[in-house]
Regions:
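Short, conserved active-site entrance elements at the starts or edges of catalytic domains
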Residues: 1, 122-149
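Conserved beta-strand hairpin/beta-sheet module of binuclear metal-dependent hydrolase folds
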Residues: 1-50, 163-177
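Short, flexible loop segments at the rims of nucleotide/cofactor-binding pockets, characterized by
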Residues: 7-12, 61-64, 149-153, 188-192
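Residue-level marker for buried hydrophobic side chains located in beta-strands
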Residues: 30-32, 62, 85, 171-173, ...
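Metallo-beta-lactamase
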Residues: 36-38, 127, 150-231, 235-236
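Active-site HxH/HxHxD metal-binding segment of metal-dependent hydrolases
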Residues: 38-40, 48-135, 234-239
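Soluble, non-transmembrane catalytic domains of enzymes that act on hydrophobic metabolites at membranes
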Residues: 57-59, 72-78, 141, 152, ...
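C-terminal regulatory/interaction regions
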Residues: 242-262
Length: 262
């Protein structure tokens, strides 16, 4: 699937767990997240068979956060094709130390559970948990090679979440900030920092973008995205259900929880 804008085309690659977005310009391509480690082959096949361009034309991979279906393929794509990787400046703290090692294993375990629930065949999921970004991103920073895009720091799902904003096209790649589950717009799993994610939703609502690229939900063109983000804040007030509680309990071993004073 592809969606055309005035200066680029957005291709949707259906990954093992999440949608991966490839932004095609005449002079290069931008990959929004790298999917799972087993999605490298899917990205390769899409570029060769659909876009008809070599993977070396991808100038930058932006990793929105460290979960397996977003960061899993980054190291492999950089090693194989020399593609630069950008991510939040503190992203490698997420899986650092013994707690981070345990968190990495648990996140891969939970990701496999999601794939199984989606009736996917079992595939390799483990990936090296440190990405050493070539470019460290901070809030409101323009992307290297693609200065028409800005990175926005939107913590709450993890501490290092970033979304990508294209002001001219009123377009947002929101990664996991909202998940479309059977037509219902829901909070991500987990929400590790409710106050921070509430502030993040306020930030995103203020942009009133007309198009959302969702890692779990596809491309959404809407008249009022502000209302959608504000409705997520209302969901934060509801008591967590058993699944939310379980995922939260399995997601608190990263040393970033203590470092952030949570």
């Amino acid at each position: 699937m592809k969606t055309s804008f005035s200066s680029f085309t957005v291709h949707t690659i259906e990954g093992y767990i999440s949608s991966i977005y490839l932004v095609e310009y005449d002079d290069g391509m931008l990959l929004m997240d790298s999917g799972c480690v087993n999605d490298v082959k899917r990205i390769e096949d899409y570029c060769k068979q659909v876009v008809n361009r070599p993977l070396g034309d991808i100038k930058l991979i932006v990793v929105s956060h460290m979960h397996p279906d977003h960061a899993g393929g980054a190291n492999a794509l950089r090693s194989k094709y020399g593609i630069a990787v950008a991510a939040h400046k503190d992203v490698d703290l997420w899986y650092s130390g013994l707690g981070g090692l345990l968190q990495h294993k648990l996140d891969c375990y939970m990701a496999m559970g999601v794939a199984q629930k989606n009736k996917r065949k079992r595939e390799h999921m483990l990936f090296y948990p440190i990405i050493h970004p070539d470019f460290l991103l901070d809030d409101l920073q323009a992307l290297p090679f693609f200065e028409d895009w800005a990175a926005l720091h939107t913590p709450g799902h993890t501490m290092h979440d970033i979304v990508l904003y294209h002001q001219k096209e009123s377009l947002l790649y929101i990664a996991d900030m909202i998940c479309d589950v059977k037509g219902k717009m829901l909070l991500p799993l987990p929400v590790l920092a409710p106050p921070q994610i509430e502030n993040s939703y306020d930030k995103l609502a203020s942009l009133n973008s007309s198009t959302l690229l969702m890692a779990h939900g596809g491309v959404k063109q809407m008249e009022d995205t502000s209302a959608l983000f504000l409705s997520m804040k209302e969901q934060l007030k509801r008591p967590p259900n058993p699944i939310m509680r379980k995922v939260y309990r399995l997601s608190t071993f990263t040393p970033e929880i203590k470092r952030q004073g949570m």
